[in-house]
């Protein structure tokens, strides 16, 4: 599967800002909820885990991959991509997060290919910068389609 295959239709968005990290998580997961990739419990599990464990899902400066355990309400494996034009601070993190990659992993294995492809993409500084400075959903989708 290509990386872009993990992103359901309408799962890539550019949003001006979020009032706080909880709203940023809501924005990043709503398309997966609407497409029945996750239950509402899954979103709450991410928030609860963030409060209890900190934002363990920050991947790189400005980039987070909010997710919870499969049994918390992941129904299908998929991803979303949300760019916040104005970054938001997560608890205990000094740098604002602008790019949220919502992850729903229905089991322990089905998302591994997507994570590998995404890691390769994010390791390239130029591509990461393009993601963080994109101005449209189409730009983001074009970048993801390279993975």
Curated annotation (Swiss-Prot):
Superkingdom of the organism of origin: Bacteria
Entry-linked InterPro entries: Ascorbate-PTS_EIIA_comp, PTrfase/Anion_transptr, PTS_EIIA_type-2_dom
Predominant location category: cytoplasm
Positions of the catalytic residues: 67 (tele-phosphohistidine intermediate)
Coiled coil start-end: none
CDD domains linked: PTS_IIA_fru
Pfam families noted in UniProt: PTS_EIIA_2
Residues in PTS EIIA type-2 domain copies: 5-147
A single BP term in Gene Ontology: phosphoenolpyruvate-dependent sugar phosphotransferase system
Subcellular location: Cytoplasm
Molecular function as annotated in GO: kinase activity; protein-phosphocysteine-L-ascorbate-phosphotransferase system transporter activity
Keywords: Cytoplasm, Kinase, Phosphoprotein, Phosphotransferase system, Sugar transport, Transferase, Transport
Keyword Cytoplasm part of the UniProt annotation: yes
SUPFAM superfamilies assigned: Phoshotransferase/anion transport protein
GO cellular component: cytoplasm
Residue numbers bearing the Phosphohistidine modification: 67
Task performed by this protein: The phosphoenolpyruvate-dependent sugar phosphotransferase system (sugar PTS), a major carbohydrate active transport system, catalyzes the phosphorylation of incoming sugar substrates concomitantly with their translocation across the cell membrane. The enzyme II CmtAB PTS system is involved in D-mannitol transport.
Domain comment as written in the entry: The PTS EIIA type-2 domain is phosphorylated by phospho-HPr on a histidyl residue. Then, it transfers the phosphoryl group to the PTS EIIB type-2 domain.
Protein name per the record: Mannitol-specific cryptic phosphotransferase enzyme IIA component
Species in which this protein is naturally found: Escherichia coli (strain K12)
């Amino acid at each position: 599967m290509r990386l872009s295959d993990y992103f359901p239709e309408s799962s890539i968005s550019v949003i001006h800002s979020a009032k706080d990290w909880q709203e940023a998580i809501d924005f990043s997961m709503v398309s997966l909820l609407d497409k029945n990739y996750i239950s509402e419990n899954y979103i709450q599990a991410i928030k609860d885990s963030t409060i209890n464990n900190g934002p363990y899902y920050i991947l790189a400066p400005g980039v987070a991959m909010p997710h919870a355990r499969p049994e918390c309400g992941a129904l299908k494996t998929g991803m979303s991509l949300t760019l916040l034009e104005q970054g938001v601070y997560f608890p205990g993190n000094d740098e604002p997060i602008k790019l949220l990659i919502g992850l729903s992993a229905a089991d322990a294995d089905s998302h591994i290919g997507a994570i590998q492809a995404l890691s390769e993409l994010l390791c390239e500084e130029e591509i990461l910068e393009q993601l963080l400075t994109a101005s449209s959903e189409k730009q983001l989708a074009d970048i993801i389609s390279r993975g």
